[in-house]
């Protein structure tokens, strides 16, 4: 009985580690998450995405809609339970309600992964985890930046800048109009791990040039990993234990002055 109570107390006090995955549209974030969910290695992973349909999860993997859903749908987010014990949430407008849903299921979650839209600034999202409502339940395990290596080699940063611009114009919640180069630098400045995606079709000189560009913008000691088709082992992606929310204020980005103002609530954070 004592051991059971101690285990229950540990589950209630344990913080859920959250990995934030950033990168432009077309970089391969969704491909990466799809591979992670289907190769979870027994981990019960909850994933927050903007659109569930983009993940392309096979219908047979869906166990059912456990919470946050009703027959008319849920505007602020839906939670899907997968057959392997993982969860998938959508968040289109408000961040806080979805986090509250996940906090209520903390004993069923080993790790949380948040995929940003690509235009979202990663630093304010990490800073949201400093708020007491999140800090007591979650910790930012790491920020992972997915880089489209061929696009960077071509000086474009994103695979399809026209599509990224269309995404920008379609997002009413976007509160900045930063050039892609600045966003790219911000994504790298906040990174704990950088994934160089799609390097399999590049020659060594191109890869070396991309690595030089990326290393110039990343903090010292950040690891660069070459990944093809999103195939990365869960043990590499998860479990870095960086507690990024404690150190994020010291990571300098282009938007630091904009981020300095006080927020009334973390609901306004863009994902």
Predicted regions and their residues:
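C-terminal accessory "lid"/substrate-recognition subdomains
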Residues: 162-271
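Short, Lys/Arg-enriched N-terminal segments with co-localized hydrophobic residues
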Residues: 1-10
